Amino acid sequence: WRVLGDIEDFIAALALERGMSEKTCIGYGSDLRLFAAYLKRRKIENAADVKREDIVDFLANEREKGMKGSTRARRTAAIRMFFRYLKERHAIPTNPSDLMDAPKKALALPRVLSEAEVFAMLDEVKGEDPVSLRDRAMLEVMYGCGLRVSELCALKNDDIVADGELLRIFGKGSKERIVPIGGAAGRALSAYLGGSRESFARGNLAETHVFLTRTGRPFTRQGVFKIVRARAAAVGIAADRISPHVLRHCFASHMLSHGADIRAIQELLGHADIGTTQVYTHVDAARIGEIHRKHHPRA
């Protein structure tokens, strides 16, 4: 069946040619296979036979099933990119998604913890044993440098540069950026590297990756997630309020509230689009509004 084959080729191209993350490729692949199943039910076998109305009807049906606006936006983006890919390769005469309106996503404000909550979580990891030193370094680096969990897991010894003052990070699409290591993060990282990392090191991968599990393997996203939740639970932070990405949100939001320039935060986070970073201005406005409501006598 031609459409499904075209989709598999497109997903492979996303990873190989455009450097998109595995998570994005999986999401787009899932969206497009749903679309392909819909086309099959309508007896449409070739991408060249798809009309704008077919796409609109598919998205309308998904919306009627209760699909969130954010999911609809992603599916629309996947379909647009798929047909653009086919058109660029002259596999279809026209792009049926060209005249479609992009669905508007509701602004979803990032979840953030207060500074006091983050500090309590970091201060809770007090031990000098190897696991405590490692966990403290991981938490401090995530919060102090604003890393994505995938970037933390991929961090290698060679990525610690400038005598331990900077990290070289390879973000989405393998884009490189340089991030300063703050004082607290730097001290925690030095303590881990100098004191406990060698107790986890075994095997070839232990020679390259910074953060290692008890078996000497690099961390997975799920492994980091478990540590973050466990350390947060120890100071009473509910599981639904914390994740590695929440610490990244806290990094940006707390810097903004202390007067950091939005463009500088964009660079540190590795956002290609300033619009992605500007959501934190809404978070700060919401925080200021809450303070006003709590403390102004006539609020």
Set out the residue ranges of the language-model regions.
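Conserved catalytic core of the tyrosine transesterase superfamily
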Residues: 1-299
